[in-house]
């Protein structure tokens, strides 16, 4: 963990070193001042020596000025180091997340990753700045003040030593207890963020079903869990300040009483008034340093859980990787599944079992099955969004695990069930498929996807701005734009995962006809609930609970497969889309 976190200090190590050095310089200047003050009182005021007062007073001003300079520089360097460190952490986390497979994403959840990149990194940033400044300043101040106090009077200085040992032990107990609560609280932050994210992204559904009160209670519960744990931590930490103040005042009283007795009994020969003033100042410095150190421990205990969570993301390796000599070209779209089994979790059940398929390049394959029959799981194995649990998937005669991952995914285009558009113009969204696509190529792809029909009606046409998530276009328009974006990749394999469900049957037919005419060499997989979407496919795969129930032409399936027959009959009689009884939502 420490190695991965230390690596992110690169570029800011010099200021990270200069910050504590400046803090030490500030402490040295502060520790000189009480000694000079003692000299002014004993050798200047008591002796009536004005020249000594002016001379030592001048040195005090110089020491104070240098202390101020070191303090300001330490603050500037510390801020630069901590903000730069946080920037490096977020950048490296984001870069590593981009390499994650779907399995890695499933492990952390989107809300969890957001929390780690925001709240957790901010905690680490604050702790890093405090460590660079206070974690060096406080011990340095305490040690130097202790040494100076012992040079004045070892008997009185021993009071400080006892107080430091007692307080140190109490701090360890307080911090260890509070750290456990903070660790649990940050885990609950994931649930809180997930609740917010889910509610905001589905706000239309929430309002449509009048579920505002339910969602408010759900958020209240998640927020209450975080509050409860943080409150417990704060209750433990609340002992810190009273304990510190009680110790400070006790030490001041003891030193004042014992010091006054020594001055009176010795006649100010073995112990002077100036030395007593210095001892009281050093007492305050020592115990204030200990208080600052306790604040550092509090911040460390808060950030320790965050540091662990951030390090997990930094050290996480994608479950997918290239081989030693990856294949750099996908020759064609021929697909073969060889005894493929797949499960999402190592200890879970198989969602795909013993899948065997042999599909020629350029064929159009329809996939039919009820919810939970693993239709989506099947096609996600083609671009290696997941790896098989057992068996092999071949594209162009080569195992998908032998391809360079980027080359493979550039050869497979997917239009997912949940279509995503990004804020920007229509043209900018479409160029996700091919960043170098010309205007003519964009227009041609839109014609194939029947998207040109509505784009031409917009005043700004292809420069029309799309809101985040595509909220200013309809579901059918969004689907057609996503299909056009996929076509711009000129893929060997095109996967349409229920991607025409929001368009009318006439437009659906036009899109399929365009595929047959414009991209005859591309292997097309069409996952659909509507029989009309797959009736012209070369072959149809019928899935039932992760197993192939039937495979053949649409006519053969209609004649021999009960599931296909039920879908066909339910729709031709006007019953709407068929949804076979299923289990988990893997379809």
Say what each PLM segment does.
Residues 11, 15-28, 39, 129-185, ...:
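Transmembrane helices of ABC transporter permease
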Residues 11-13, 99-103, 119-132, 136, ...:
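An intracellular "coupling" helix at the cytosolic face of ABC transporter transmembrane type-1 domains
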Residues 49-53, 144, 148-162, 169, ...:
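Helix-loop-helix
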Residues 1-11, 113:
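A short amphipathic helical element positioned immediately N-terminal to and/or at the very start
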Residues 21-22, 29-42, 63-110, 114, ...:
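Juxtamembrane helix-loop junctions of ABC transporter transmembrane domains
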Residues 328-587:
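ABC-type nucleotide-binding domain
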Residues 47-48, 83, 91-115, 119-121, ...:
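Short intracellular "coupling" helices and adjacent cytoplasmic loop segments at the cytosolic face
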Residues 10, 16-73, 77, 150-155, ...:
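Transmembrane helix-loop-helix hairpins at lipid-water interfaces of multipass membrane proteins
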């Amino acid at each position: 963990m420490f190695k991965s976190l230390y690596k992110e200090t690169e570029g800011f190590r010099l200021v990270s070193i200069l910050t504590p050095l400046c803090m030490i310089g500030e402490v040295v200047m502060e520790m000189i001042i009480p000694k000079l003050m003692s000299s002014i009182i004993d050798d200047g005021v008591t002796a009536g020596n004005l020249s000594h007062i002016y001379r030592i007073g001048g040195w005090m001003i110089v020491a104070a000025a240098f202390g101020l300079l070191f303090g300001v520089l330490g603050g500037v360097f510390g801020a630069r180091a901590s903000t730069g460190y946080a920037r490096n952490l977020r950048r490296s986390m984001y870069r590593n997340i981009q390499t994650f497979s779907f399995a890695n994403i499933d492990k952390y959840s989107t809300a969890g990753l957001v929390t780690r990149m925001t709240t957790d990194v901010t905690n680490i940033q604050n702790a890093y700045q405090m460590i660079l400044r206070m974690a060096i300043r406080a011990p340095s101040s305490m040690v130097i003040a202790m040494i100076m106090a012992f040079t004045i009077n070892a008997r009185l200085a021993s009071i400080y030593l006892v107080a430091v040992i007692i307080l140190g032990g109490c701090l360890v107990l307080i911090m260890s207890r509070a750290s456990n609560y903070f660790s649990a609280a940050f885990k609950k932050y994931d649930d809180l963020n997930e609740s917010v994210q889910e509610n905001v992204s589905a706000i239309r559904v929430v309002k449509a079903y009048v579920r505002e009160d339910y969602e408010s209670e759900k958020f209240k519960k998640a927020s209450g869990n975080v509050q409860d744990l943080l409150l417990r931590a704060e209750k433990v930490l609340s002992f810190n300040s009273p304990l510190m103040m009680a110790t400070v005042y006790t030490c001041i009283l003891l030193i004042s009483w014992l010091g006054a007795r020594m001055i009176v009994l010795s006649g100010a020969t073995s112990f002077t008034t100036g030395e007593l003033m210095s001892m009281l100042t050093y007492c305050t410095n020592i115990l204030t340093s200990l208080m600052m150190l306790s604040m550092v421990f509090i911040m460390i205990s808060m950030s320790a859980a965050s540091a662990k969570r951030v390090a997990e993301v930094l050290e996480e390796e994608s479950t997918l990787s290239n081989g030693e000599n990856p294949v750099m070209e996908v020759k064609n779209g021929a697909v073969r599944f060889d005894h493929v089994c797949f499960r999402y979790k190592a200890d879970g059940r198989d969602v795909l079992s013993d899948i065997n398929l042999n599909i020629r390049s350029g064929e159009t394959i329809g996939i039919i099955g009820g919810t939970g029959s693993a239709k989506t799981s099947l096609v996600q194995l083609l671009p290696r969004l997941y790896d098989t649990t057992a068996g092999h998937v071949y594209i162009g005669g080569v195992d998908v695990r032998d391809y360079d991952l980027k080359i493979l995914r550039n050869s497979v285009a997917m239009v997912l069930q949940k279509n995503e558009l990004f804020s920007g113009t229509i043209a900018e969204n479409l160029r996700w498929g091919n960043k170098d696509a010309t205007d003519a190529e964009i227009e041609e792809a839109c014609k194939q996807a029947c998207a040109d029909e509505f784009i031409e009606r917009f005043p700004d046409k292809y420069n029309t701005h799309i809101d985040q998530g595509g909220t200013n276009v309809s579901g059918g328009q969004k689907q057609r734009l996503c299909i056009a974006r996929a076509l711009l990749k000129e893929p060997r394999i095109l996967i349409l995962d229920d991607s025409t469900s929001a368009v009318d049957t006439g437009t659906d037919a036009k899109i399929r006809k365009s595929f047959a005419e414009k991209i005859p060499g591309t292997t097309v997989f069409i996952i659909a609930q509507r029989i009309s979407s797959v009736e012209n496919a070369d072959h149809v795969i019928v899935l039932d609970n992760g197993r192939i129930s039937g495979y053949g032409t649409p006519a053969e399936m209609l004649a021999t497969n009960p599931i296909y027959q039920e879908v066909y009959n339910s729709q031709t009689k006007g019953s709407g889309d068929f949804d076979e009884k299923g289990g988990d939502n893997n379809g």
